[in-house]
């Protein structure tokens, strides 16, 4: 080549001529959807990375596209002469041959470098550049300000086209690529249009790889980052393996920051979500895990997984059921806790009130509707308690020793007349007692307990509270309870038992069941101090009488304490217990009071008589109605049994009738057959008799005729007399039923022949 000294002619290594011809043919073929690895001869080039042309077109900005379009228009005029160089290869491949410019003598090979001349004839390194010739490609890369066309004045070849300053990217050759189906081609185009994530090569972190950004400027040329691991031939080894697009080495170009590599399908590189969904199938439901969940959720998840046979994925219905169960459990737990807190708040509210408020009935009547339902019931039950106040009964202590209140009477009488009444009384006193109050009688009992002077302080403690929420929203609370009474004389008593509370949805008490099982009486040291001072003396002055007196004083102290005195009354004053008994009676007479108020009966005795009579009538009516219902049910059962029996009898009778009818029909048929047979036999016999008689008559007639004929013949011929004796007739005894007819016909014929002969 004849060129200027200031122009640098940089040549690249090329393969054999056959490979150059294949490269020239590939440059004229349209670009496919994705790129493959270059031929083996091209792997010996440098490590400069390039991006496919089609991918650069999608990643270019609007200004670059406009500049590229303008330069394309300029290049179309310059490349008309260059199209003649590929005429032979295009004709060999069956493609249309472009028109050749007569002024164009030849063109360089597409794999060779073009010397770019400089008009100023200076040795500036910025102009020492090379360009890759590709007749089917567009000049892309730098903006229009950096695209400076060069002059070909210093070159001996005047036909050399004017090339842009930016070289074109090299597109690797596709060897024997089979045609793909339309669906796969469309999918590949969609994958190229979508941005694909870039992953670092093996052995490098993402911070070390910068594929889409230029690294440095070397003499005016933007060189791509070369941080990829080099392969065995010196070329880059992409992340996707041999099927991934490879970049030809020794090609410097300007790479856009948005440049990305297009991945072919079924590669090991990064794949888009659609490919990932196709490879892994439809999305599966995530398996429920028990980590980071509450104990209830863990239990429900384990139960559902075991119910579904150990499968992690559950149906939507099962998940909804589990969620509903968890929600209901949470609601029930919160509701039960709220009920317990409501009871504790009520106790705290009462304990913080002043004595004046607690001793007033109006205070209790005000707070009762807020915490109890109008139909609420309060029950107090006590077990066997011994000691205190001798052998007195509870009714004797309270003063309500009435016959209808004497419910603790002995149930059985002993046959021995020498039994002691004291033992009976002690047995009656040790029996448990049951009391029941309503919302109208409970406030007076509470106020009377506070108004007693002997009790200084009362403590209530609840421990071990448990709850259960029912299906209708009610809450049952069960807890241990302890009542501690402190008296003026320094003694104290403790009652231990259980309490059951039923609360409604609005957290109001429906009923309370209080059971006391233990009573303990104690004396404090302060109460014993004064007594002990008077008893204790010097050891020298103590005698047997003094010791005996000390014991008696201690016994009197224990017996006279308030805690021991109130043992039979459960630690409360007899007056308060009297009100409790009256409240129990009034609560049991609640129906009587309602009856008297409804019927406007002022007299309680008359209302009681009418109530008892009406209750008896109601009981009788209810009993009669019950008996009528039972009788009706029994009658219906009997009717059903009879109907069933009749159905069975009818069924059996119908079957018997059917069998009898069949039998009678069979007998009738047999009789008819027998009659028909008899009639046939009779008809045969009569026919035989008639035939025999007819045959005999015919034979007689024939004989007579024959005799006459013979006589006539003899007379006419003058023949032998008595010629009829020679003619014999068959005997009727040996003739069958059919033979006489034949012989009769023959006889007739014979008679006719005889007549004709005459």
Curated annotation (Swiss-Prot):
<dbReference type="GO" id="GO:0005634">
    <property type="term" value="C:nucleus"/>
</dbReference>
<feature type="compositionally biased region" description="Low complexity">
    <location>
        <begin position="183"/>
        <end position="210"/>
    </location>
</feature>
<feature type="compositionally biased region" description="Low complexity">
    <location>
        <begin position="666"/>
        <end position="715"/>
    </location>
</feature>
<feature type="compositionally biased region" description="Polar residues">
    <location>
        <begin position="722"/>
        <end position="734"/>
    </location>
</feature>
<comment type="similarity">
    <text>Belongs to the MFG1 family.</text>
</comment>
<keyword id="KW-0539">Nucleus</keyword>
<comment type="function">
    <text>Transcriptional regulator with a general role in all morphogenetically distinct forms of filamentous growth, namely invasive growth and biofilm formation. May control FLO11 gene expression as part of a promoter-bound complex with FLO8 and MSS1. Important for virulence.</text>
</comment>
<feature type="compositionally biased region" description="Low complexity">
    <location>
        <begin position="11"/>
        <end position="31"/>
    </location>
</feature>
<feature type="region of interest" description="Disordered">
    <location>
        <begin position="408"/>
        <end position="433"/>
    </location>
</feature>
<dbReference type="InterPro" id="IPR052145">
    <property type="entry name" value="Mediator/Homeobox_domain"/>
</dbReference>
<feature type="compositionally biased region" description="Low complexity">
    <location>
        <begin position="408"/>
        <end position="430"/>
    </location>
</feature>
<dbReference type="Pfam" id="PF01803">
    <property type="entry name" value="LIM_bind"/>
</dbReference>
<dbReference type="GO" id="GO:0030447">
    <property type="term" value="P:filamentous growth"/>
</dbReference>
<feature type="region of interest" description="Disordered">
    <location>
        <begin position="650"/>
        <end position="758"/>
    </location>
</feature>
<feature type="compositionally biased region" description="Polar residues">
    <location>
        <begin position="142"/>
        <end position="168"/>
    </location>
</feature>
<keyword id="KW-0804">Transcription</keyword>
<feature type="compositionally biased region" description="Polar residues">
    <location>
        <begin position="218"/>
        <end position="229"/>
    </location>
</feature>
<dbReference type="InterPro" id="IPR029005">
    <property type="entry name" value="LIM-bd/SEUSS"/>
</dbReference>
<feature type="compositionally biased region" description="Polar residues">
    <location>
        <begin position="100"/>
        <end position="116"/>
    </location>
</feature>
<feature type="compositionally biased region" description="Polar residues">
    <location>
        <begin position="650"/>
        <end position="665"/>
    </location>
</feature>
<comment type="subunit">
    <text>Interacts with FLO8 and MSS11, both morphogenetic transcription factors binding directly to the FLO11 promoter.</text>
</comment>
<feature type="region of interest" description="Disordered">
    <location>
        <begin position="1"/>
        <end position="49"/>
    </location>
</feature>
<protein>
    <recommendedName>
        <fullName>Morphogenetic regulator of filamentous growth protein 1</fullName>
    </recommendedName>
</protein>
<keyword id="KW-0805">Transcription regulation</keyword>
<feature type="compositionally biased region" description="Polar residues">
    <location>
        <begin position="249"/>
        <end position="261"/>
    </location>
</feature>
<feature type="compositionally biased region" description="Low complexity">
    <location>
        <begin position="117"/>
        <end position="128"/>
    </location>
</feature>
<feature type="region of interest" description="Disordered">
    <location>
        <begin position="87"/>
        <end position="293"/>
    </location>
</feature>
<feature type="compositionally biased region" description="Low complexity">
    <location>
        <begin position="264"/>
        <end position="288"/>
    </location>
</feature>
<feature type="compositionally biased region" description="Polar residues">
    <location>
        <begin position="1"/>
        <end position="10"/>
    </location>
</feature>
């Amino acid at each position: 080549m004849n060129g200027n000294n200031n122009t640098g002619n940089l040549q690249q290594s090329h393969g054999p001529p056959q490979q150059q011809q294949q490269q020239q043919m590939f440059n004229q073929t349209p670009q496919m959807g994705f790129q493959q690895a270059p031929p083996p001869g091209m792997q010996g080039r440098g490590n400069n990375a390039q991006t496919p042309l089609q991918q650069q077109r999608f990643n270019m900005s609007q200004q670059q596209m406009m500049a590229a379009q303008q330069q394309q228009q300029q290049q179309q005029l310059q490349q008309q002469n260059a199209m003649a160089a590929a005429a032979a290869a295009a004709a060999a491949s069956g493609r249309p041959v472009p028109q050749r410019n007569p002024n164009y003598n030849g063109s360089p090979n597409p794999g060779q470098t073009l010397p770019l001349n400089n008009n100023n004839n200076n040795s500036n390194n910025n102009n020492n550049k090379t360009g890759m010739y590709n007749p089917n490609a567009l000049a892309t890369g730098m903006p229009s300000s950096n695209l400076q066309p060069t002059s070909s004045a210093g070159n001996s070849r005047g036909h050399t086209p004017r090339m842009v300053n930016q070289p074109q990217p090299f597109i690797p050759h596709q060897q024997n690529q089979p045609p793909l189906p339309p669906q796969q081609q469309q999918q590949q185009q969609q994958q190229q249009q979508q941005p694909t994530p870039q992953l670092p090569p093996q052995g490098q972190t993402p911070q070390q790889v910068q594929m889409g950004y230029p690294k440095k400027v070397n003499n005016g040329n933007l060189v791509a980052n070369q941080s990829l691991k080099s392969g065995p031939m010196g070329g880059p080894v992409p992340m996707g393996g041999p099927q991934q697009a490879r970049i030809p080495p020794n090609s410097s170009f300007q790479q856009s920051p948005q440049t990305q590599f297009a991945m072919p399908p079924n590669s090991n590189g990064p794949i888009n979500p659609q490919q990932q969904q196709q490879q892994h199938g439809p999305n599966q439901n995530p398996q429920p895990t028990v980590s980071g969940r509450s104990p209830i959720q863990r239990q429900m998840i384990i139960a559902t997984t075991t119910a579904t046979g150990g499968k992690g994925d559950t149906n939507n219905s099962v998940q909804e059921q589990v969620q509903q169960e968890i929600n209901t459990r949470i609601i029930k737990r919160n509701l039960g806790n709220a009920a317990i807190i409501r009871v504790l708040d009520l106790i705290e509210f009462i304990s913080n009130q002043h004595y004046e408020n607690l001793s007033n009935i109006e205070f209790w009547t005000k707070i009762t509707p807020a915490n109890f339902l109008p139909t609420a019931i309060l029950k107090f039950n006590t077990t066997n308690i011994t000691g205190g106040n001798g052998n007195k009964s509870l009714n004797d202590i309270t003063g309500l020793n009435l016959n209808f209140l004497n419910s603790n009477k002995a149930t059985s009488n002993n046959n021995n007349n020498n039994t002691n009444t004291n033992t009976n009384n002690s047995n009656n006193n040790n029996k448990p007692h049951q009391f029941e109050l309503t919302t109208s009688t409970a406030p007076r009992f509470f106020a009377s307990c506070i108004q007693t002077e002997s009790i200084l302080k009362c403590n209530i403690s609840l421990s071990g509270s448990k709850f259960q929420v029912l299906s209708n929203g009610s809450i049952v609370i069960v807890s241990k309870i302890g009542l501690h009474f402190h008296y003026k004389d320094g003694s104290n008593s403790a009652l231990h038992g259980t309490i059951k509370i039923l609360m409604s949805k609005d957290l109001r008490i429906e009923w309370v069941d209080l059971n006391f099982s233990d009573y303990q009486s104690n004396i404090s040291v302060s109460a014993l101090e004064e007594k002990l001072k008077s008893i204790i003396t010097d050891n020298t002055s103590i005698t047997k009488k003094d010791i005996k007196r000390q014991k008696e004083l201690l016994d009197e102290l224990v017996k006279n304490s308030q805690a021991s005195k109130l043992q039979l009354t459960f630690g409360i004053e007899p007056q308060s217990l009297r009100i409790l008994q009256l409240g129990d009676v009034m609560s049991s007479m609640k129906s009587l009071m309602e009856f008297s108020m409804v019927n406007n009966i002022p007299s309680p005795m008359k209302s009681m008589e009418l109530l008892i009579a009406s209750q008896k009538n109601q009981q009788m009516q209810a009993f009669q109605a019950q008996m009528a219902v039972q009788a009706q049910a029994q009658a219906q059962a009997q009717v059903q049994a009879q109907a069933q029996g009749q159905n069975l009898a009818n069924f059996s009778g119908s079957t018997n009738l059917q069998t009898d009818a069949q039998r009678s029909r069979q007998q009738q048929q047999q009789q008819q057959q027998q009659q028909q047979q008899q009639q046939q036999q009779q008809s045969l016999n009569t026919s035989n008799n008639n035939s025999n008689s007819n045959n005999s008559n015919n034979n007689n007639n024939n004989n007579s005729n024959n005799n006459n004929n013979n006589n006539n013949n003899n007379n006419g011929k003058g023949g032998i007399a008595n010629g009829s004796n020679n003619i014999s007739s068959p005997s009727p005894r040996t003739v069958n039923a059919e033979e006489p007819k034949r012989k009769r016909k023959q006889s007739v014929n014979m008679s006719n022949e005889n007549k004709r002969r005459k």
